[in-house]
From Swiss-Prot:
This is Large ribosomal subunit protein bL34. It comes from Actinobacillus pleuropneumoniae serotype 5b (strain L20). InterPro entries: Ribosomal_bL34, Ribosomal_bL34_CS. Disulfide bonds: none annotated. Coiled coil: none annotated. Residues 31-44 have a biased composition (Basic residues). Signal peptide: none annotated. Belongs to the bacterial ribosomal protein bL34 family. Keywords: Ribonucleoprotein, Ribosomal protein. The gene is rpmH. The lineage of its organism: Bacteria, Pseudomonadati, Pseudomonadota, Gammaproteobacteria, Pasteurellales. One of its GO terms (molecular function) is structural constituent of ribosome. One of its GO terms (biological process) is translation.
Length: 44
């Protein structure tokens, strides 16, 4: 059986990266929440 997690830096950045978050309204809400919580890292 193949493992489901096959890491790829590019895929990770495209789906969970800062620019991907900024592209949608909800993504911006995610960033706002993480800023409010005081997260050291906002996105992948």
């Amino acid at each position: 059986m193949k493992r489901t997690f096959q890491p790829s830096v590019l895929k990770r950045a495209r789906t969970h990266g800062f620019r991907a978050r900024m592209a949608t309204k909800n993504g911006r809400q995610v960033l706002a929440r993480r800023r409010a919580k005081g997260r050291k890292s906002l996105s992948a």
